[in-house]
Amino acid sequence: MVTIRADEISNIIRERIEQYNREIKIVNTGTVLQVGDGIARIHGLDEVMAGELVEFEEGTIGIALNLESSNVGVVLMGDGLMIQEGSSVKATGRIAQIPVSESYLGRVINALAKPIDGRGEISASESRLIESPAPGIISRRSVYEPLQTGLIAIDSMIPIGRGQRELIIGDRQTGKTAVATDTILNQKGQNVICVYVAIGQKASSVAQVVTTFQERGAMEYTIVVAETADSSATLQYLAPYTGAALAEYFMYRERHTLIIYDDLSKQAQAYRQMSLLLRRPPGREAYPGDVFYLHSRLLERAAKSSSRLGEGSMTALPIVETQSGDVSAYIPTNVISITDGQIFLSADLFNAGIRPAINVGISVSRVGSAAQIKAMKQVAGKSKLELAQFAELEAFAQFASDLDKATQNQLARGQRLRELLKQSQAAPLRVEEQVATIYTGANGYLDSLEIGQVKKFLVQLRTHLKTNKPQFQEIISSTKTLTGDAEALLKEAIQEQLELFLLQEQT
Protein backbone atom coordinates (compact mmCIF):
# COMPACT_ATOMS: atom_id res chain seq x y z
CA MET A 1 0.00 0.00 0.00
CA VAL A 2 1.29 3.49 -0.97
CA THR A 3 1.99 5.71 2.01
CA ILE A 4 1.11 9.38 1.63
CA ARG A 5 3.77 11.63 3.14
CA ALA A 6 2.20 14.91 4.14
CA ASP A 7 5.51 16.79 4.47
CA GLU A 8 6.52 15.87 0.90
CA ILE A 9 3.20 17.09 -0.49
CA SER A 10 3.40 20.34 1.46
CA ASN A 11 6.98 20.91 0.17
CA ILE A 12 5.84 20.43 -3.43
CA ILE A 13 2.92 22.82 -2.93
CA ARG A 14 5.23 25.42 -1.30
CA GLU A 15 7.68 25.13 -4.24
CA ARG A 16 4.92 25.58 -6.79
CA ILE A 17 3.58 28.63 -4.93
CA GLU A 18 7.08 30.18 -4.88
CA GLN A 19 7.54 29.48 -8.59
CA TYR A 20 4.19 30.98 -9.53
CA ASN A 21 4.67 34.30 -11.22
CA ARG A 22 1.60 36.26 -12.16
CA GLU A 23 2.27 38.53 -15.12
CA ILE A 24 -0.04 41.48 -15.50
CA LYS A 25 -0.06 42.75 -19.07
CA ILE A 26 -2.03 45.81 -20.07
CA VAL A 27 -2.86 45.78 -23.78
CA ASN A 28 -4.08 48.92 -25.46
CA THR A 29 -6.74 47.73 -27.92
CA GLY A 30 -9.32 49.17 -30.28
CA THR A 31 -11.93 48.17 -32.86
CA VAL A 32 -11.97 48.81 -36.61
CA LEU A 33 -14.75 51.24 -37.56
CA GLN A 34 -14.00 51.40 -41.28
CA VAL A 35 -11.21 50.39 -43.65
CA GLY A 36 -10.39 51.17 -47.29
CA ASP A 37 -7.92 52.96 -49.61
CA GLY A 38 -5.02 52.04 -47.31
CA ILE A 39 -6.60 53.85 -44.34
CA ALA A 40 -8.36 52.43 -41.26
CA ARG A 41 -10.42 54.30 -38.65
CA ILE A 42 -10.13 52.77 -35.17
CA HIS A 43 -12.34 53.27 -32.12
CA GLY A 44 -10.45 52.89 -28.82
CA LEU A 45 -6.63 52.78 -28.66
CA ASP A 46 -6.89 55.51 -26.00
CA GLU A 47 -3.21 55.40 -25.00
CA VAL A 48 -1.74 55.24 -28.54
CA MET A 49 1.13 57.59 -29.45
CA ALA A 50 1.48 59.53 -32.71
CA GLY A 51 3.56 57.44 -35.11
CA GLU A 52 3.14 54.24 -33.04
CA LEU A 53 2.86 50.91 -34.84
CA VAL A 54 -0.44 49.07 -34.40
CA GLU A 55 -1.19 45.44 -35.24
CA PHE A 56 -4.46 44.21 -36.71
CA GLU A 57 -6.05 40.87 -35.84
CA GLU A 58 -4.99 39.29 -39.16
CA GLY A 59 -1.35 40.46 -38.92
CA THR A 60 -1.27 43.70 -40.96
CA ILE A 61 0.82 46.48 -39.40
CA GLY A 62 -0.21 50.15 -39.53
CA ILE A 63 1.00 53.53 -38.26
CA ALA A 64 -1.24 55.76 -36.11
CA LEU A 65 -1.01 59.16 -37.80
CA ASN A 66 -4.23 60.98 -36.88
CA LEU A 67 -5.20 61.08 -33.20
CA GLU A 68 -8.73 62.51 -33.09
CA SER A 69 -11.21 62.83 -30.22
CA SER A 70 -13.53 60.08 -31.45
CA ASN A 71 -11.18 57.79 -33.43
CA VAL A 72 -7.62 57.10 -34.56
CA GLY A 73 -6.62 57.35 -38.26
CA VAL A 74 -4.18 54.57 -39.18
CA VAL A 75 -2.28 54.16 -42.47
CA LEU A 76 -1.71 50.54 -43.48
CA MET A 77 1.62 48.98 -44.46
CA GLY A 78 -0.10 46.43 -46.67
CA ASP A 79 -3.21 46.03 -48.80
CA GLY A 80 -5.43 45.38 -45.74
CA LEU A 81 -7.83 43.22 -47.78
CA MET A 82 -8.38 40.78 -44.89
CA ILE A 83 -9.17 43.46 -42.29
CA GLN A 84 -12.85 43.44 -41.33
CA GLU A 85 -15.05 46.00 -39.66
CA GLY A 86 -15.29 45.22 -35.95
CA SER A 87 -12.01 43.27 -35.80
CA SER A 88 -9.61 44.14 -32.99
CA VAL A 89 -6.42 46.19 -33.18
CA LYS A 90 -3.68 46.43 -30.56
CA ALA A 91 -0.97 49.03 -30.01
CA THR A 92 2.55 47.56 -30.06
CA GLY A 93 4.29 50.24 -27.96
CA ARG A 94 6.95 50.61 -30.69
CA ILE A 95 7.57 53.16 -33.42
CA ALA A 96 8.77 52.19 -36.90
CA GLN A 97 12.31 50.81 -36.89
CA ILE A 98 14.40 48.59 -39.15
CA PRO A 99 17.27 46.13 -38.62
CA VAL A 100 20.66 47.44 -39.85
CA SER A 101 24.00 45.75 -40.55
CA GLU A 102 26.87 45.44 -43.05
CA SER A 103 25.02 42.43 -44.55
CA TYR A 104 22.64 44.80 -46.36
CA LEU A 105 25.39 45.77 -48.84
CA GLY A 106 24.67 44.33 -52.27
CA ARG A 107 21.00 43.65 -51.50
CA VAL A 108 17.65 44.95 -52.80
CA ILE A 109 15.15 45.57 -49.99
CA ASN A 110 11.74 47.19 -49.45
CA ALA A 111 10.76 50.05 -47.11
CA LEU A 112 10.53 47.63 -44.17
CA ALA A 113 14.12 46.44 -44.85
CA LYS A 114 12.88 43.01 -45.99
CA PRO A 115 14.87 41.50 -48.90
CA ILE A 116 13.06 41.40 -52.26
CA ASP A 117 15.89 40.01 -54.39
CA GLY A 118 15.20 36.34 -53.62
CA ARG A 119 18.61 35.79 -51.99
CA GLY A 120 17.43 34.79 -48.53
CA GLU A 121 17.20 36.59 -45.20
CA ILE A 122 19.63 39.30 -44.08
CA SER A 123 21.25 38.84 -40.68
CA ALA A 124 21.24 41.91 -38.42
CA SER A 125 21.91 42.27 -34.71
CA GLU A 126 21.09 45.97 -34.42
CA SER A 127 18.14 48.17 -35.28
CA ARG A 128 17.62 51.89 -35.97
CA LEU A 129 14.53 54.08 -35.87
CA ILE A 130 13.28 54.93 -39.37
CA GLU A 131 12.77 58.53 -38.21
CA SER A 132 15.68 59.77 -36.12
CA PRO A 133 16.70 63.36 -35.34
CA ALA A 134 19.20 65.07 -37.63
CA PRO A 135 22.69 65.86 -36.24
CA GLY A 136 22.83 69.16 -34.32
CA ILE A 137 25.03 72.16 -35.07
CA ILE A 138 27.87 71.01 -32.79
CA SER A 139 27.85 67.52 -34.35
CA ARG A 140 28.59 68.91 -37.83
CA ARG A 141 31.50 70.52 -39.61
CA SER A 142 31.58 72.41 -42.90
CA VAL A 143 31.90 70.44 -46.13
CA TYR A 144 35.46 70.36 -47.45
CA GLU A 145 36.09 67.01 -49.18
CA PRO A 146 34.98 66.51 -52.79
CA LEU A 147 32.56 63.76 -53.79
CA GLN A 148 33.49 63.08 -57.41
CA THR A 149 30.55 62.30 -59.70
CA GLY A 150 32.70 61.41 -62.71
CA LEU A 151 30.78 63.97 -64.81
CA ILE A 152 32.98 66.83 -66.04
CA ALA A 153 30.17 69.41 -66.08
CA ILE A 154 29.36 68.78 -62.40
CA ASP A 155 32.83 68.24 -60.93
CA SER A 156 34.24 71.33 -62.63
CA MET A 157 31.39 73.86 -62.33
CA ILE A 158 28.84 72.57 -59.78
CA PRO A 159 31.08 70.61 -57.37
CA ILE A 160 29.53 68.38 -54.73
CA GLY A 161 31.21 67.83 -51.36
CA ARG A 162 30.85 64.97 -48.87
CA GLY A 163 27.97 65.86 -46.54
CA GLN A 164 26.25 68.18 -49.01
CA ARG A 165 22.62 68.03 -50.24
CA GLU A 166 22.48 68.72 -53.99
CA LEU A 167 19.14 68.60 -55.80
CA ILE A 168 18.89 67.06 -59.29
CA ILE A 169 15.88 68.69 -60.93
CA GLY A 170 14.36 68.48 -64.41
CA ASP A 171 11.46 67.30 -66.55
CA ARG A 172 10.78 63.61 -67.14
CA GLN A 173 13.19 61.87 -69.52
CA THR A 174 16.03 64.39 -69.15
CA GLY A 175 18.57 62.01 -67.61
CA LYS A 176 18.12 62.69 -63.86
CA THR A 177 18.47 59.03 -62.85
CA ALA A 178 21.45 58.66 -65.23
CA VAL A 179 23.34 61.46 -63.42
CA ALA A 180 22.62 59.81 -60.05
CA THR A 181 23.54 56.26 -61.13
CA ASP A 182 26.74 57.47 -62.84
CA THR A 183 27.71 59.09 -59.53
CA ILE A 184 27.25 55.72 -57.79
CA LEU A 185 29.34 53.95 -60.47
CA ASN A 186 32.11 56.53 -59.94
CA GLN A 187 32.35 55.71 -56.20
CA LYS A 188 34.05 52.38 -56.97
CA GLY A 189 37.28 52.22 -54.99
CA GLN A 190 36.49 55.54 -53.21
CA ASN A 191 35.37 53.84 -49.96
CA VAL A 192 31.86 55.33 -50.18
CA ILE A 193 28.74 53.31 -49.28
CA CYS A 194 25.85 54.11 -51.64
CA VAL A 195 22.10 53.82 -51.00
CA TYR A 196 19.74 54.14 -53.97
CA VAL A 197 16.09 54.70 -52.98
CA ALA A 198 13.54 54.13 -55.77
CA ILE A 199 10.14 55.64 -54.89
CA GLY A 200 7.05 54.87 -56.97
CA GLN A 201 8.99 53.88 -60.08
CA LYS A 202 8.26 51.15 -62.60
CA ALA A 203 9.66 47.80 -61.48
CA SER A 204 11.34 47.44 -64.91
CA SER A 205 13.26 50.74 -64.40
CA VAL A 206 14.51 49.62 -60.97
CA ALA A 207 15.52 46.22 -62.40
CA GLN A 208 17.49 48.01 -65.14
CA VAL A 209 19.37 50.14 -62.58
CA VAL A 210 20.16 47.06 -60.44
CA THR A 211 21.43 45.18 -63.54
CA THR A 212 23.73 48.12 -64.42
CA PHE A 213 25.11 48.14 -60.86
CA GLN A 214 25.70 44.37 -60.95
CA GLU A 215 27.43 44.46 -64.35
CA ARG A 216 29.73 47.30 -63.27
CA GLY A 217 30.55 45.79 -59.85
CA ALA A 218 28.79 48.63 -58.00
CA MET A 219 26.46 46.39 -55.96
CA GLU A 220 29.40 45.48 -53.68
CA TYR A 221 29.10 48.88 -51.99
CA THR A 222 25.43 49.69 -52.74
CA ILE A 223 22.05 49.03 -51.08
CA VAL A 224 18.90 49.46 -53.19
CA VAL A 225 15.66 50.35 -51.36
CA ALA A 226 12.72 49.93 -53.75
CA GLU A 227 9.02 50.64 -53.42
CA THR A 228 7.56 50.49 -56.92
CA ALA A 229 4.45 52.18 -58.34
CA ASP A 230 2.18 49.35 -57.18
CA SER A 231 3.26 49.65 -53.52
CA SER A 232 0.93 51.24 -50.98
CA ALA A 233 1.24 55.00 -50.40
CA THR A 234 2.44 54.33 -46.82
CA LEU A 235 5.43 52.29 -48.01
CA GLN A 236 6.33 54.84 -50.72
CA TYR A 237 6.22 57.53 -48.02
CA LEU A 238 8.47 55.48 -45.70
CA ALA A 239 11.09 54.33 -48.27
CA PRO A 240 13.33 57.47 -48.14
CA TYR A 241 13.44 57.36 -44.32
CA THR A 242 14.45 53.68 -44.45
CA GLY A 243 17.27 54.55 -46.86
CA ALA A 244 18.37 57.43 -44.60
CA ALA A 245 18.42 55.12 -41.54
CA LEU A 246 20.70 52.66 -43.39
CA ALA A 247 23.03 55.46 -44.56
CA GLU A 248 23.14 56.90 -41.01
CA TYR A 249 24.19 53.50 -39.64
CA PHE A 250 27.37 53.72 -41.75
CA MET A 251 27.85 57.48 -41.22
CA TYR A 252 27.97 57.05 -37.43
CA ARG A 253 30.56 54.31 -37.96
CA GLU A 254 32.91 56.92 -39.43
CA ARG A 255 32.20 55.91 -43.05
CA HIS A 256 31.28 58.04 -46.06
CA THR A 257 27.85 57.45 -47.58
CA LEU A 258 25.94 58.70 -50.61
CA ILE A 259 22.14 58.45 -50.75
CA ILE A 260 19.95 59.06 -53.78
CA TYR A 261 16.19 59.65 -53.45
CA ASP A 262 14.60 58.92 -56.84
CA ASP A 263 12.34 60.82 -56.63
CA LEU A 264 10.86 63.02 -53.89
CA SER A 265 7.96 64.25 -56.08
CA LYS A 266 6.49 60.75 -55.88
CA GLN A 267 7.00 60.60 -52.11
CA ALA A 268 5.16 63.93 -51.77
CA GLN A 269 2.32 62.57 -53.92
CA ALA A 270 2.07 59.45 -51.74
CA TYR A 271 1.99 61.64 -48.62
CA ARG A 272 -0.67 63.88 -50.20
CA GLN A 273 -2.80 60.79 -50.93
CA MET A 274 -2.50 59.59 -47.31
CA SER A 275 -3.25 63.05 -45.90
CA LEU A 276 -6.32 63.64 -48.05
CA LEU A 277 -7.71 60.20 -47.17
CA LEU A 278 -7.13 60.99 -43.49
CA ARG A 279 -9.14 64.18 -44.16
CA ARG A 280 -6.33 66.56 -43.22
CA PRO A 281 -6.93 70.07 -44.62
CA PRO A 282 -5.30 70.52 -48.06
CA GLY A 283 -3.06 73.49 -48.87
CA ARG A 284 -1.30 74.65 -52.06
CA GLU A 285 -1.64 72.11 -54.94
CA ALA A 286 -3.71 70.01 -52.45
CA TYR A 287 -0.55 69.07 -50.51
CA PRO A 288 -0.92 69.07 -46.70
CA GLY A 289 0.51 71.94 -44.68
CA ASP A 290 3.47 69.92 -43.35
CA VAL A 291 4.85 68.75 -46.73
CA PHE A 292 7.85 71.09 -46.26
CA TYR A 293 8.62 69.35 -42.95
CA LEU A 294 8.27 65.98 -44.72
CA HIS A 295 11.31 66.79 -46.87
CA SER A 296 13.28 69.04 -44.49
CA ARG A 297 13.46 66.42 -41.73
CA LEU A 298 14.65 63.88 -44.30
CA LEU A 299 17.30 66.03 -46.00
CA GLU A 300 18.63 67.55 -42.75
CA ARG A 301 19.84 64.07 -41.81
CA ALA A 302 22.58 64.40 -44.45
CA ALA A 303 25.67 65.88 -42.80
CA LYS A 304 29.43 65.95 -42.49
CA SER A 305 30.18 64.74 -38.94
CA SER A 306 32.55 66.67 -36.69
CA SER A 307 35.99 65.26 -35.83
CA ARG A 308 34.64 64.26 -32.39
CA LEU A 309 32.15 61.94 -34.13
CA GLY A 310 34.72 60.49 -36.53
CA GLU A 311 34.20 62.69 -39.62
CA GLY A 312 31.78 60.30 -41.34
CA SER A 313 29.47 61.82 -43.93
CA MET A 314 26.12 61.37 -45.62
CA THR A 315 25.73 63.10 -48.98
CA ALA A 316 22.17 63.34 -50.32
CA LEU A 317 21.21 63.72 -53.98
CA PRO A 318 17.43 64.13 -54.01
CA ILE A 319 15.72 64.07 -57.41
CA VAL A 320 12.62 66.15 -58.16
CA GLU A 321 10.60 66.03 -61.38
CA THR A 322 9.23 69.26 -62.86
CA GLN A 323 6.32 69.76 -65.27
CA SER A 324 7.44 71.59 -68.47
CA GLY A 325 10.42 73.14 -66.72
CA ASP A 326 8.36 74.88 -64.02
CA VAL A 327 10.89 75.28 -61.20
CA SER A 328 8.51 77.57 -59.28
CA ALA A 329 5.98 74.82 -58.45
CA TYR A 330 5.42 73.92 -54.78
CA ILE A 331 7.62 70.83 -54.28
CA PRO A 332 10.57 72.08 -56.44
CA THR A 333 10.74 75.42 -54.56
CA ASN A 334 10.50 73.63 -51.21
CA VAL A 335 13.36 71.24 -51.97
CA ILE A 336 15.49 73.97 -53.61
CA SER A 337 15.24 76.00 -50.39
CA ILE A 338 16.28 73.01 -48.24
CA THR A 339 19.25 71.82 -50.34
CA ASP A 340 22.75 73.30 -50.81
CA GLY A 341 22.36 73.82 -54.54
CA GLN A 342 20.71 72.28 -57.58
CA ILE A 343 21.67 70.68 -60.88
CA PHE A 344 19.06 71.71 -63.43
CA LEU A 345 18.56 69.37 -66.40
CA SER A 346 16.96 70.91 -69.46
CA ALA A 347 14.73 69.07 -71.94
CA ASP A 348 15.83 71.46 -74.74
CA LEU A 349 19.52 70.65 -74.19
CA PHE A 350 18.71 66.94 -73.96
CA ASN A 351 16.84 67.05 -77.28
CA ALA A 352 19.70 69.03 -78.84
CA GLY A 353 22.02 66.10 -78.07
CA ILE A 354 23.88 67.79 -75.20
CA ARG A 355 24.08 65.03 -72.60
CA PRO A 356 24.27 65.20 -69.63
CA ALA A 357 21.73 67.99 -70.31
CA ILE A 358 22.93 70.26 -67.49
CA ASN A 359 21.93 73.91 -67.75
CA VAL A 360 25.10 75.40 -66.29
CA GLY A 361 23.62 78.92 -66.16
CA ILE A 362 20.98 78.20 -63.49
CA SER A 363 22.65 75.23 -61.78
CA VAL A 364 24.56 76.11 -58.64
CA SER A 365 26.48 74.53 -55.77
CA ARG A 366 26.33 76.55 -52.55
CA VAL A 367 29.45 74.80 -51.25
CA GLY A 368 31.45 75.87 -54.28
CA SER A 369 35.18 75.40 -54.68
CA ALA A 370 35.53 74.17 -51.07
CA ALA A 371 34.49 70.82 -52.54
CA GLN A 372 37.16 70.73 -55.27
CA ILE A 373 40.74 69.58 -55.34
CA LYS A 374 43.29 72.33 -56.08
CA ALA A 375 44.07 71.00 -59.56
CA MET A 376 40.40 71.30 -60.56
CA LYS A 377 40.18 74.84 -59.14
CA GLN A 378 43.25 75.79 -61.19
CA VAL A 379 41.83 74.64 -64.53
CA ALA A 380 38.06 75.13 -64.10
CA GLY A 381 37.99 78.53 -62.41
CA LYS A 382 36.74 80.54 -65.38
CA SER A 383 34.86 77.87 -67.35
CA LYS A 384 31.41 78.48 -65.80
CA LEU A 385 31.57 82.20 -66.58
CA GLU A 386 32.90 81.52 -70.09
CA LEU A 387 30.06 79.09 -70.83
CA ALA A 388 27.42 81.50 -69.49
CA GLN A 389 28.85 84.30 -71.67
CA PHE A 390 28.94 81.93 -74.65
CA ALA A 391 25.26 80.99 -74.23
CA GLU A 392 24.35 84.70 -74.15
CA LEU A 393 26.53 85.44 -77.18
CA GLU A 394 25.12 82.47 -79.10
CA ALA A 395 21.56 83.74 -78.61
CA PHE A 396 22.64 87.21 -79.80
CA ALA A 397 24.62 85.81 -82.77
CA GLN A 398 21.45 84.26 -84.23
CA PHE A 399 20.21 87.76 -85.08
CA ALA A 400 23.53 89.38 -86.03
CA SER A 401 24.72 88.91 -89.62
CA ASP A 402 28.38 89.95 -89.48
CA LEU A 403 30.42 89.32 -86.34
CA ASP A 404 33.91 90.62 -85.61
CA LYS A 405 36.85 88.20 -85.32
CA ALA A 406 37.01 88.29 -81.50
CA THR A 407 33.32 87.36 -81.22
CA GLN A 408 33.75 84.54 -83.76
CA ASN A 409 36.71 83.19 -81.77
CA GLN A 410 34.73 83.37 -78.52
CA LEU A 411 31.84 81.48 -80.14
CA ALA A 412 34.20 78.83 -81.53
CA ARG A 413 35.87 78.37 -78.12
CA GLY A 414 32.46 78.12 -76.41
CA GLN A 415 31.23 75.47 -78.84
CA ARG A 416 34.32 73.36 -78.18
CA LEU A 417 34.00 73.82 -74.41
CA ARG A 418 30.39 72.66 -74.60
CA GLU A 419 31.48 69.69 -76.70
CA LEU A 420 34.06 68.54 -74.14
CA LEU A 421 31.37 68.51 -71.42
CA LYS A 422 29.38 65.86 -73.33
CA GLN A 423 29.66 62.37 -71.88
CA SER A 424 28.10 58.99 -72.61
CA GLN A 425 25.95 57.35 -69.94
CA ALA A 426 27.72 55.00 -67.49
CA ALA A 427 31.14 56.36 -68.53
CA PRO A 428 32.32 58.44 -65.54
CA LEU A 429 35.83 59.92 -65.71
CA ARG A 430 38.51 60.00 -63.01
CA VAL A 431 39.36 63.47 -61.71
CA GLU A 432 42.84 63.35 -63.33
CA GLU A 433 41.22 62.72 -66.73
CA GLN A 434 38.78 65.58 -66.13
CA VAL A 435 41.61 68.00 -65.29
CA ALA A 436 43.42 67.07 -68.53
CA THR A 437 40.21 67.43 -70.58
CA ILE A 438 39.29 70.88 -69.22
CA TYR A 439 42.89 72.15 -69.48
CA THR A 440 42.94 71.15 -73.17
CA GLY A 441 39.74 73.07 -73.94
CA ALA A 442 40.35 76.11 -71.74
CA ASN A 443 43.82 76.73 -73.18
CA GLY A 444 42.68 76.70 -76.81
CA TYR A 445 44.25 73.40 -77.90
CA LEU A 446 40.93 72.31 -79.43
CA ASP A 447 40.52 75.48 -81.52
CA SER A 448 42.29 73.94 -84.53
CA LEU A 449 39.89 70.96 -84.59
CA GLU A 450 36.45 70.69 -86.14
CA ILE A 451 33.62 70.42 -83.57
CA GLY A 452 32.87 66.87 -84.72
CA GLN A 453 36.48 65.82 -84.04
CA VAL A 454 36.65 67.07 -80.42
CA LYS A 455 35.18 64.00 -78.70
CA LYS A 456 37.31 61.55 -80.71
CA PHE A 457 40.49 63.54 -80.00
CA LEU A 458 39.81 63.75 -76.25
CA VAL A 459 39.24 59.98 -75.99
CA GLN A 460 42.59 59.39 -77.75
CA LEU A 461 44.32 62.00 -75.56
CA ARG A 462 43.11 60.33 -72.34
CA THR A 463 44.32 56.93 -73.59
CA HIS A 464 47.68 58.47 -74.63
CA LEU A 465 48.11 60.05 -71.17
CA LYS A 466 47.28 56.80 -69.40
CA THR A 467 49.69 54.65 -71.43
CA ASN A 468 52.57 57.06 -72.18
CA LYS A 469 52.45 59.60 -69.33
CA PRO A 470 51.34 57.67 -66.20
CA GLN A 471 53.37 60.11 -64.05
CA PHE A 472 50.74 62.81 -64.78
CA GLN A 473 47.99 60.83 -63.02
CA GLU A 474 50.36 59.93 -60.17
CA ILE A 475 51.26 63.60 -59.54
CA ILE A 476 47.60 64.75 -59.57
CA SER A 477 46.35 61.90 -57.34
CA SER A 478 49.18 62.31 -54.79
CA THR A 479 49.52 66.13 -54.62
CA LYS A 480 45.94 67.06 -55.74
CA THR A 481 47.61 69.98 -57.55
CA LEU A 482 48.49 70.73 -61.18
CA THR A 483 52.21 71.22 -60.51
CA GLY A 484 54.68 72.62 -63.04
CA ASP A 485 55.89 69.07 -63.82
CA ALA A 486 52.33 67.81 -64.34
CA GLU A 487 51.52 70.76 -66.63
CA ALA A 488 54.68 70.17 -68.68
CA LEU A 489 53.77 66.48 -69.08
CA LEU A 490 50.22 67.40 -70.09
CA LYS A 491 51.33 70.01 -72.65
CA GLU A 492 53.77 67.49 -74.14
CA ALA A 493 51.06 64.81 -74.39
CA ILE A 494 48.59 67.25 -76.00
CA GLN A 495 51.14 68.39 -78.62
CA GLU A 496 52.13 64.79 -79.44
CA GLN A 497 48.52 63.61 -79.70
CA LEU A 498 47.43 66.69 -81.70
CA GLU A 499 50.14 66.12 -84.33
CA LEU A 500 49.30 62.42 -84.53
CA PHE A 501 45.55 63.09 -84.71
CA LEU A 502 45.80 65.71 -87.48
CA LEU A 503 48.07 63.35 -89.43
CA GLN A 504 45.52 60.52 -89.08
CA GLU A 505 42.65 62.79 -90.16
CA GLN A 506 44.50 63.88 -93.31
CA THR A 507 45.15 60.31 -94.48
UniProtKB/Swiss-Prot annotation:
It catalyses: ATP + H2O + 4 H(+)(in) = ADP + phosphate + 5 H(+)(out). ATP binds at residues 170-177. The record marks 363 as: Required for activity. It is found in: Plastid, Chloroplast thylakoid membrane. Keywords: ATP synthesis, ATP-binding, CF(1), Chloroplast, Hydrogen ion transport, Ion transport, Membrane, Nucleotide-binding, Plastid, Thylakoid, Translocase, Transport. Its EC number is 7.1.2.2. SUPFAM superfamilies: C-terminal domain of alpha and beta subunits of F1 ATP synthase (SSF47917), N-terminal domain of alpha and beta subunits of F1 ATP synthase (SSF50615), P-loop containing nucleoside triphosphate hydrolases (SSF52540). Gene3D superfamilies: 2.40.30.20, ATP synthase alpha/beta chain, C-terminal domain, P-loop containing nucleotide triphosphate hydrolases. Its main location: plastid. One of its GO terms (cellular component) is proton-transporting ATP synthase complex. It is an enzyme of class 7 (translocase). InterPro entries: ATP_synth_asu-like_sf (IPR023366), ATP_synth_asu_C (IPR000793), ATP_synth_asu_C_sf (IPR038376), ATP_synth_F1_a_nt-bd_dom (IPR033732), ATP_synth_F1_asu (IPR005294), ATPase_a/bsu_AS (IPR020003), ATPase_F1/V1/A1_a/bsu_N (IPR004100), ATPase_F1/V1/A1_a/bsu_N_sf (IPR036121). It is a peripheral membrane protein. Transmembrane segments: none annotated. GO terms for molecular function: ADP binding; ATP binding; proton-transporting ATP synthase activity, rotational mechanism. Belongs to the ATPase alpha/beta chains family. F-type ATPases have 2 components, CF(1) - the catalytic core - and CF(0) - the membrane proton channel. CF(1) has five subunits: alpha(3), beta(3), gamma(1), delta(1), epsilon(1). CF(0) has four main subunits: a, b, b' and c. Produces ATP from ADP in the presence of a proton gradient across the membrane. The alpha chain is a regulatory subunit. This is ATP synthase subunit alpha, chloroplastic. The lineage of its organism: Eukaryota, Viridiplantae, Streptophyta, Embryophyta, Tracheophyta. The gene is atpA.
